[in-house]
Amino acid sequence: MDAAGESEEPVSGEALSIAHALSHPPESYGNDPDIEMAWAIRAMQHAEVYYKLISSVDPQFLKLTKVDDQIYSEFREIFETLRVDVLDPEELKSESAKEKWRPFCLKFEGIVEDYNYGTLLRLDCSQGYTEENTIFAPRIQFFAIEIARNREGYNKAVSVSIQDKEGEEGAGNKEEAAEKGADSGGEKEEGANREGEK
């Protein structure tokens, strides 16, 4: 038991250390690989939870923050022509785009918790989180784009796609079960008919 207790202590100490490190603003750190990894893990966990959420319900009715209406109206006021179904990274990361995004993001400082935390954002909303389909963005940028995708119906493709896959898998299993049941049930049924006829 002592050996197990010793191995658990560094893990819990490490977890506390990571939690403590993540509580500081990212600007206060250099390029510490451990910190970068902790941020990447947290961003990936957020992405996984969000993708499961939009896969399991109709995203059009999701509420991501208490101020979704404000985020959406201000986003569409400033970025009225921005395509949100398939994003162009230049419209998020170029110098001219950053000049336009910066004031928008700063409007939500103190309103949206962790508004500037790094978050993974899908470029093509009809696809999942893959290395090729993901860009790192501030959380408020993620919220603005994903709220627009949800309200404008673009994320529905994800839930429909997942439900179609589940339906195909379920139908395949039902057909297989029906074939097995028909084989065994058919023999029993024939036997019952013979007995009933005799």
UniProtKB/Swiss-Prot annotation:
Residues with Phosphoserine modification: 126, 184
Superkingdom classification of source: Eukaryota
Keywords: Phosphoprotein
Basic and acidic residues composition-biased segments: 171-198
InterPro entries: PBDC1-like_dom_sf, PBDC1_metazoa/fungi, Polysacc_synth_dom
Annotated segments matching region Disordered: 163-198
Family, per entry: Belongs to the PBDC1 family.
Official protein name in the record: Protein PBDC1
